[in-house]
Curated annotation (Swiss-Prot):
Name this protein carries in UniProt: ETS-related transcription factor Elf-2
UniProt feature, compositional bias: Low complexity: 370-383
Organism encoding this protein: Mus musculus (Mouse)
Function comment: Probably transcriptionally activates the LYN and BLK promoters and acts synergistically with RUNX1 to transactivate the BLK promoter.
Location of Phosphoserine modifications: 107, 185, 191, 363, 372, 432
InterPro entries: Ets_dom, ETS_fam, TF_Elf_N, WH-like_DNA-bd_sf, WH_DNA-bd_sf
C-alpha cells in the first residue's frame, strides 16, 4: 500500500510503502489501480482542503479501513472513492493534474448530508462533474515529487502529460506553470459576433476616421464650401477645393503637423479597397461616397439670412395663446417724428418682462403743408409710407379679440407735417383713416436693419374707462339716415360696434379696425368706432401740431369688479375730445442697435 498525502500548501509527496506493492505487483500490475479522494478540512484558511491520496491494489477492505480511520480523526469528513480502469498500456500519467484537482475539489452534493463512509464506484469512460478521475501507475508514483501551484479563480489545465509506458527511470521534479487567462468576451450572450473585441480606431484615443472627418467638414459652414464642397450631393460626389488646407486640418486633428495631401491621399486610396470612397475619373480632387450617408446637414453657398416674413409663417400657429397681464402692461407705438420740438430723450420703464418682437412703424412723407385737424386728408397714391423695422422688447398684450399682439403697424395717411394721426372726414369722403393692428409673430435679434437710432417722442395717452365708454352714445342729427352706438356686451373682452355710423359734416371721427391673421373658425375682426367732437379743434391746431399720436391697449376693470374690458384707444388731439376721459403723460421709448 502506498499513501500520498498532500497538504493545502504542499509541494512534497510522501510515499511510505509497506511492501504490499512488491508482493502483489506481479499479479495485479495490469489490473485497475484506484484513487481514494478524501476532502479533509484544513487548519489553514488560505486553501480550502487538504487531500490524502492512497494508491492501493486491493479493492475489498482497504477503503473501509481508511474511511473508518479518517472518520475518527475528523468527525465531519466525507469519503469518496473515485475509481477508473486503465485502458491500455498507453495510459498517461495524470498525477500533477489530479493533485491540483483534489485541492479544488469539493464534496459531492449527494454525500453532503451523510456522515457515514460511502463507497462510490465510477465505471470506466464515464465522466461526471461531481468526481475527479485520475489513473495512477504504481511504478511511476513511487518516486514522484509533486509541486502544486493553485489559484481558486483559475481553471484547471486538463491537458495530459505524456510519459513513456515502459520507462522505469526515476522521474525528475516537474513544475506546472500558471495557465494564462482566457479572454472573456465583453458580452456573453452566446453571440460570436458580439464577443469579438473591436479594434482600436485611429490610434490613441481618436475615434474619427478620415472619411468621417471629411463628412464633418462638408457639414460645417466654416469649411464648406471654402475648403471642401459638394458637386453632386445626391450622388455623394464632393471636391477638395483647398486640398492643402484640408490636409492641414486633418493633421491638426491627428496631432501630426507634417501632414500633407500625399499622406492623406494614401489613406483615401485605402478606402477605395474598402468600398467606402471612389475616385471620380477625369476630375482632380473629386471623390465620391459609395454609400451616401443619411441625415446630413446641407450647407448652401447662396443661403441667405432667414427673413422675418419666413419666420412669421413658421410661428403663426404659436401666436394664438392667452396671456393674462395687468393693466400696466401696454403695447405702445407712435410715429417717429423727425425734427420734433418735444424730442427730449427719456427712458420708458417697462412694467413686466417683455418678449422679443418686431414693431413696424410707418411714418408719412412730408410735403411741408400744414393742415388743421378738421380738414379732410385724402389718401394719395404717391404718399408711400416709409417703414422702419425696429427690434425691441415689447410686452405681450391681449386685445379684445383674444389674440396675441406681437407687431404693430401704424400708418398715417395724411401728408401734413405734424398733422394729427386721425383726421376728420365727411360722409362724402371715399374712406376714413384707419389704424391697423396686425398679428405678425416674428422673432428677430435685437438690432435694427439700418442701424438707426429710433427715438419715440413723448406722447399723451388717453385712457377711457370701461364704464364711461359703455355709456357714450354717438349723437346724430335728425336729417341723417342712421345712427350708431358703442356697446359692451357678452363676455368681458367683447367690444361690438354697430355700423353704419352717420355723423355731421366736419365732425372729427376716430375709427379703429383690428384685422389679424387668424386661423379658420375664429371670430372675424371687430371694429371699434368712437365719435370725437372738436369745437375748439381749429384754435388748438397749432398748439397740438407737434403732439405725437399714440396707440394704446388698455385693460380696465368695471365698477362691479367682475368684468374686465380691453380697449384699443387712438388719440388725435387730446383737448378736442368731449368724452369723459383721463389724461396722463408717458415717457418716451428709446430703441437703438
Amino acid at each position: 500500500m502506498a499513501s500520498a498525502v498532500v497538504d493545502s500548501g504542499g509541494s512534497a509527496l510522501e510515499l511510505p510503502s509497506d511492501g504490499g506493492e512488491n508482493q502483489e505487483g506481479g499479479d495485479t500490475g495490469p489490473d485497475c489501480p484506484a484513487v481514494i479522494v478524501e476532502p479533509v478540512p484544513s487548519a489553514r484558511l488560505e486553501q480550502g482542503y487538504a487531500a490524502q491520496v492512497l494508491v492501493y491494489d486491493d479493492e475489498t477492505y482497504m477503503m473501509q479501513d481508511v474511511a473508518e480511520e479518517q472518520e475518527v480523526e475528523t468527525e465531519n469528513s466525507e469519503t469518496v472513492e473515485a475509481s477508473v480502469h486503465s485502458s491500455n498500456a498507453h495510459c498517461t500519467d495524470k498525477t500533477i493534474e489530479a493533485a491540483e484537482a483534489l485541492l479544488h475539489m469539493e464534496s459531492p452534493t449527494c454525500l453532503r448530508d451523510s456522515r457515514s463512509p460511502v463507497e462510490v464506484f465510477v465505471p470506466p469512460c464515464i465522466s461526471t462533474p461531481e468526481f475527479i478521475h485520475a489513473a495512477m501507475r504504481p511504478d511511476v508514483i513511487t518516486e514522484t515529487v509533486v509541486e502544486v501551484s493553485t489559484e481558486e479563480s483559475e481553471p484547471m489545465d486538463a491537458s495530459p502529460i505524456p510519459t513513456s509506458p515502459d520507462s522505469h527511470e526515476p522521474m525528475k521534479k516537474k513544475k506546472v506553470g500558471r495557465k494564462p487567462k482566457t479572454q472573456q468576451s465583453p458580452v456573453s450572450n452566446g453571440s460570436p459576433e458580439l464577443g469579438i473585441k473591436k479594434k482600436a480606431r485611429e490610434g490613441k484615443g481618436n475615434t474619427t476616421y478620415l472619411w468621417e472627418f471629411l463628412l464633418d467638414l462638408l457639414q460645417d459652414k466654416n469649411t464648406c464650401p471654402r475648403y471642401i464642397k459638394w458637386t453632386q450631393r445626391e450622388k455623394g460626389i464632393f471636391k477638395l477645393v483647398d486640398s492643402k488646407a484640408v490636409s492641414k486640418l486633418w493633421g491638426k486633428h491627428k496631432n501630426k503637423p507634417d501632414m500633407n495631401y500625399e499622406t492623406m491621399g494614401r489613406a483615401l486610396r485605402y478606402y477605395y479597397q474598402r468600398g467606402i470612397l471612389a475616385k471620380v475619373e477625369g476630375q482632380r480632387l473629386v471623390y465620391q461616397f459609395k454609400d451616401m450617408p443619411k441625415n446630413i446637414v446641407v450647407i448652401d453657398d447662396d443661403k441667405s439670412e432667414t427673413c422675418p416674413e419666413d419666420l412669421a409663417a413658421a410661428a403663426d400657429d404659436k401666436s394664438l395663446e392667452r396671456v393674462s397681464l395687468s393693466a400696466e402692461s401696454l403695447l405702445k407705438a407712435a410715429t417717429a417724428v423727425r425734427g420734433g420740438k418735444n424730442s427730449s430723450p427719456l427712458n420708458c420703464s417697462r412694467a413686466e418682462k417683455g418678449v422679443a418682437r418686431v414693431v413696424n412703424i410707418t411714418s408719412p412723407t412730408h410735403d411741408g403743408s400744414s393742415r388743421s385737424p378738421t380738414t379732410t386728408a385724402p389718401v394719395s397714391a404717391a404718399a408711400a409710407p416709409r417703414t422702419v423695422r425696429v427690434a425691441m422688447q415689447v410686452p405681450v398684450v391681449m386685445t379684445s379679440l383674444g389674440q396675441k399682439i406681437s407687431a404693430v403697424a401704424v400708418q398715417s395717411v395724411n401728408a401734413g407735417t405734424g398733422s394729427p394721426l386721425i383726421t376728420s372726414t365727411s360722409p362724402a369722403s371715399a374712406s376714413s383713416p384707419k389704424v391697423v393692428i396686425q398679428t405678425v409673430p416674428t422673432v428677430m435679434p435685437a438690432s435694427t436693419e439700418n442701424g438707426d437710432r429710433i427715438t419715440m417722442q413723448p406722447a399723451k395717452i388717453i385712457t377711457i374707462p370701461a364704464t364711461q365708454l359703455a355709456q357714450c352714445q354717438l349723437q346724430a342729427k335728425s336729417n341723417l339716415t342712421g345712427s350708431g352706438s358703442i356697446n359692451i356686451v357678452g363676455t368681458p373682452l367683447a367690444v361690438r360696434a354697430l355700423t353704419p355710423v352717420s355723423i355731421a359734416h366736419g365732425t372729427p371721427v376716430m375709427r379703429l379696425s383690428v384685422p389679424a391673421q387668424q386661423a379658420s373658425g375664429q371670430t372675424p375682426p371687430r371694429v371699434i368706432s368712437a365719435l370725437l367732437k372738436g369745437p375748439e379743434g381749429k384754435s388748438e391746431a397749432k398748439k397740438q401740431e407737434h403732439d405725437v399720436k399714440t396707440l394704446q391697449l388698455v385693460e380696465e376693470k368695471g365698477a362691479d369688479g367682475n368684468k374686465t374690458v380691453t380697449h384699443v384707444v387712438v388719440v388725435s388731439a387730446p383737448s378736442a375730445i368731449a368724452l369723459p376721459v383721463t389724461m396722463k403723460t408717458e415717457g418716451l421709448v428709446t430703441c437703438e442697435k
